[in-house]
Amino acid sequence: GGMVRNVRAENLSAALINEILERHPEVNPDEVEDVIWGCVNQTKEQGFNIARFISLMTPLPHRCAAQTVNRLCASSMTAIHSAAMAIMSGQGEVFFCGGVEHMGHVPMDHGVDPNPSSSLFSAKASGMMGLTAEMVAIQHRVSREDQDSFAFRSHQRASKSTTSGRFSREIVGVEGHDQEGHLQFCLEDEVIRHDAKLDEIAALKPVFNPVSGPVTAGTSSA
């Protein structure tokens, strides 16, 4: 597991809201109209309107509303859209928007029972992003070499931006545990490979189509 394997989804999100309020004392918690949080697999610790449980762990008043929205990968974006529409229609002025998905605690397919006949009405591999990437690579002729080079450049850019502090205003540190179980304060994305090497990425085996697929762990997002 990763750094936050022992931290629940609600705690992760509550820490974010608490830090934002701490960084921006000009924001009055009493003026927050709604907490709108995106989440796809709304079960276990992410169930029963996780946005409400997150809100209760912050200085926001109990009268502040909270809702959890689901539009799969666009859930957090939909949360922002919903808040924007509410502001434009005069239903409030201050909102907290975000999203959470703790796949270490709630796996992507946990409790999911897709209808087999739905494949008759949807695109091939539309239910799995890994195979979708494989199909896109075939349709648009994106070679393995191009993908590896793109991934390598992404790690280089992420490393440079992180070490130079470009993301410091966008990241809220949280307590977690390293691989040895020691308590540690996490201040950066732990999947960035600061020492990434193109030849090592090129040597990785495909994970979604093991026969001839070009997509590997090195070219997949975390």
State what each model feature region is.
Residues 88-140:
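Flexible glycine-/small-residue-enriched beta->alpha junction loops
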Residues 69-100, 137-167:
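Active-site-proximal alpha-helical scaffold in enzymes
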Residues 1-3:
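Generic N-terminal amphipathic, Lys/Arg-enriched alpha-helix
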Residues 9-24, 50-54, 79, 129-136, ...:
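Short, well-ordered amphipathic alpha-helical segments that serve as non-catalytic structural scaffolds
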Residues 7, 29, 39-93, 123-134, ...:
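Conserved catalytic cysteine-centered active-site region
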Residues 5-6, 10-15, 26, 146-222:
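N-terminal extracellular/periplasmic Venus flytrap/periplasmic-binding protein-like
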Residues 39, 99, 178:
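Residues that line or immediately flank small-molecule/substrate-binding pockets and catalytic motifs
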